[in-house]
């Protein structure tokens, strides 16, 4: 497994407000708090602060809260969507899940963890692309996956 990309000295960052201009996701499904660095059309590094107040912890699992794996994958997909949708020609489009390949869950993510989300776009043919993604907590890999996405026009 490759080490994650590091944040550059002169990073391109996005606050939560700026992120909301690119991604359509809103509470409770906005799973990236901010972007630490990104290169449009190539890669993005996001941050998610996992709090005990997240609604999914009420049922997964009350006595031993663990962030659901599908939500980790969604957070990675949203990070990749930042890279794809930050290109001027993709402004206002949606990035939809097309598939998940080779997902591996390596570490549980629990309340108090800070996720560093990495997604690198490795292929794109027309509106369909592939991203290699990983999420890290305290320097340890929590999940890796290859994600397929499709870009589409957003409804007005």
Please provide the spans of the model-predicted regions.
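Active-site helix/loop of acyl-thioester processing domains in fatty-acid/polyketide metabolism
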Residues: 35, 66-90
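Mixed-charge, glycine-accented linear interaction segment located at domain edges/termini
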Residues: 128-130, 134-155
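N-terminal leader/capping segments at the start of a protein or of a new domain
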Residues: 1-32
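Hydrophobic beta-strand-centered segment that forms part of the acyl-chain substrate-binding groove
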Residues: 2-14, 80-116, 144-150
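Catalytic strand-loop segment that frames the active site of acyl-thioester-processing enzymes
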Residues: 27-67
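Hydrophobic beta-sheet segments that form the core/acyl-binding groove
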Residues: 35, 101-138
């Amino acid at each position: 497994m490759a080490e994650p990309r590091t944040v550059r000295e002169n990073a391109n960052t996005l606050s939560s407000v700026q992120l909301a201009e690119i991604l359509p996701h809103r509470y409770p499904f906005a799973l990236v708090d901010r972007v630490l660095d990104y290169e449009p059309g190539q890669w993005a590094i996001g941050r998610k602060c996992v709090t005990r107040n997240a609604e999914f912890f009420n049922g997964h699992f009350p006595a031993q809260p663990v962030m659901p794996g599908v939500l980790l994958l969604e957070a990675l997909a949203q990070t990749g969507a930042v890279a794809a949708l930050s290109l001027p020609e993709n402004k206002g489009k949606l990035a939809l899940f097309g598939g998940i390949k080779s997902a591996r869950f390596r570490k549980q993510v629990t309340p108090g963890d800070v996720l560093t989300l990495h997604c690198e776009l490795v292929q794109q043919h027309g509106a369909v692309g592939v991203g290699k993604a990983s999420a890290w907590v305290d320097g340890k890999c929590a999940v890796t996956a290859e994600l397929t996405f499709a870009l589409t026009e957003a409804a007005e």
